[in-house]
């Protein structure tokens, strides 16, 4: 029991800074929305449309680079720290290549935006302008993620938290300058949010790079001179590990976007109630997602040390802590659901629907916690392909079709409206949780030599 208590303390010490960093990132999006809305409703809508395209594109790159964390954690645990610098440099090369692809996609996103049904031309122009300003921040964001993953792989999660709050503090005044045109800058409205956010990502990257260069604990990692050329073997391995994570993230984001589109014809009340419940659920999701990042670090580190039993302890402890957190957030959601909905909207119909959907959200929080921590465990074992197949099957083969049938058809029961899609979420997330656990058990039952051989690749 003592080893689980000790492991839980170490997991929480890693996870809490990640949670706070995520809060800062979420707050940046909130600030952009509020400040753009203060300028005009059209500008706020433009930022919302632009963000809905930016997120899937940049999260694809973000997911690809998540492969660095278990690689670095494993090298650190095995005492091969001299190889970390090379892996980080390959991460920067990969981030550079992906940045170019993301920037090309975002530059041409105007074709998608202008093809939207009945979109106002002025709104479309502002959304395109916002994206074309924001895309210059893509390299800064992805380079920052490489540096952050280096720190997190070395079990240092506080620098990411500090840089997140630094970004938030810089974002507010820079937004103000470019939205309203102060200090000789042009008045750009919502487009100014894109300029400000792009600048903030570069500030965060430069600050993180400065920390890494001056941190005593990383002196041995920056001994090698010169930046070096791309290593095709190392980059191929990073892509093999990262691509399934990137695709899983992409399909998860697009799933919720597709559901939002399917709910939109049902009416204003249904859309508003669905959005409130989804927004609050996303806030609660920060807790297990951050814990999953900590579990990846601990499992990777323990495997690097050559201890499959300690890796199992880290995995089980992470699941136990995650389930306890989910039970607490579920009780909180059920108890205060009406009060939470009232914070978003005071329309009685919207509040009633949002409160009903939050009951379903409370049910799936436990499954969601298990599946996302399970994903973190599998990343620690470097078993990322299964993450993609499980996620795709659970969400797109089981969850979405079930939700569609329950919400919009009479095949099983009378049409349930938005609640049907939320039942689909429960089916999809529960399926993912079960499959993740089965895969984890399969991996852990393999001979230690095979597990360690995979981890060392």
From Swiss-Prot:
Domain of life of the source: Bacteria
A matching Pfam family: MatE
Keywords in alphabetical order: Antiport, Cell inner membrane, Cell membrane, Ion transport, Membrane, Sodium, Sodium transport, Transmembrane, Transmembrane helix, Transport
Gene Ontology molecular function: any one: xenobiotic transmembrane transporter activity
GO biological process: sodium ion transport; xenobiotic transmembrane transport
Locations listed in the record: Cell inner membrane
GO CC entries: plasma membrane
Signal peptide location: none
Topology in the lipid bilayer: Multi-pass membrane protein
Residue ranges crossing the lipid bilayer per the database entry: 11-31, 53-73, 93-113, 127-147, 160-180, 188-208, 243-263, 276-296, 314-334, 350-370, 387-407, 418-438
Described function: Multidrug efflux pump that functions probably as a Na(+)/drug antiporter.
PANTHER family on file: FMN_FAD EXPORTER YEEO-RELATED, MULTIDRUG RESISTANCE PROTEIN NORM-RELATED
Record-stated family: Belongs to the multi antimicrobial extrusion (MATE) (TC 2.A.66.1) family. MdtK subfamily.
Protein name (Swiss-Prot/TrEMBL): Multidrug resistance protein MdtK
Lineage of the species this protein comes from: Bacteria, Pseudomonadati, Pseudomonadota, Gammaproteobacteria, Enterobacterales
């Amino acid at each position: 029991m003592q080893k689980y208590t000790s492991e839980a303390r170490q997991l929480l010490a890693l996870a809490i800074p990640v949670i706070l960093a995520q809060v800062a990132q979420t707050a940046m999006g909130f600030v952009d929305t509020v400040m753009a809305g203060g300028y005009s409703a059209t500008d706020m809508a433009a930022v919302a449309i632009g963000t809905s395209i930016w997120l899937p594109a940049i999260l694809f790159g973000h997911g690809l680079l998540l492969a660095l964390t278990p690689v670095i954690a494993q090298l650190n645990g095995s005492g091969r720290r001299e190889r970390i610098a090379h892996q980080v440099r390959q991460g920067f090369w990969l981030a550079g290549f992906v940045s170019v692809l993301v920037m090309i996609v975002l530059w041409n996103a105007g074709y998608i935006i202008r093809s939207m049904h009945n979109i106002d031309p002025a709104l479309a122009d502002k959304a395109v302008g916002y994206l074309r300003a924001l895309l210059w921040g893509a390299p800064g964001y992805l380079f920052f993620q490489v540096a952050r993953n280096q720190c997190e792989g070395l079990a240092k999660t506080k620098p990411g938290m500090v840089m997140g709050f630094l970004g938030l503090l810089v974002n507010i005044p820079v937004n103000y300058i470019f939205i309203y045109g102060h200090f000789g800058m042009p008045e750009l409205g919502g487009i100014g949010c894109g300029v400000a956010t792009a600048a903030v990502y570069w500030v965060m990257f430069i600050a993180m790079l400065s920390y890494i260069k001056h941190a005593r604990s990383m002196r041995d990692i920056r001994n090698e001179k010169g930046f070096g050329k791309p290593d095709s073997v190392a980059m191929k391995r990073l892509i093999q590990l990262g691509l399934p994570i990137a695709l899983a993230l992409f399909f998860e984001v697009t799933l919720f976007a597709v559901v939002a589109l399917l709910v939109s014809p049902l009416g204003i009340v249904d859309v508003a109630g669905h959005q409130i419940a989804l927004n609050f659920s996303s806030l609660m999701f920060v807790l297990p997602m951050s814990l999953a990042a900590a579990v990846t670090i601990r499992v990777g580190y323990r495997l690097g040390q050559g201890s499959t039993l300690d890796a199992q302890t880290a995995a089980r402890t992470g699941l136990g802590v995650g389930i306890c957190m989910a039970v607490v957030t579920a009780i909180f959601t059920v108890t205060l659901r009406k009060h939470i909905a009232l914070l978003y909207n005071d329309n009685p119909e919207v509040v009633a629907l949002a409160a009903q959907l939050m009951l379903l959200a409370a049910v799936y929080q436990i499954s969601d916690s298990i599946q996302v921590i399970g994903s973190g465990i599998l990343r620690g074992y470097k078993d990322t392909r299964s993450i993609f197949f499980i996620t795709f099957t659970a969400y797109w083969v089981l969850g979405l079709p079930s939700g569609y049938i329950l919400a919009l058809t009479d095949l099983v029961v009378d049409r349930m409206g938005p609640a049907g899609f939320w039942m689909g979420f429960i089916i999809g997330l529960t399926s993912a949780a079960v499959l993740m656990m089965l895969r984890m058990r399969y991996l852990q039952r393999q001979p230690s030599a095979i597990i360690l051989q995979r981890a060392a690749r």
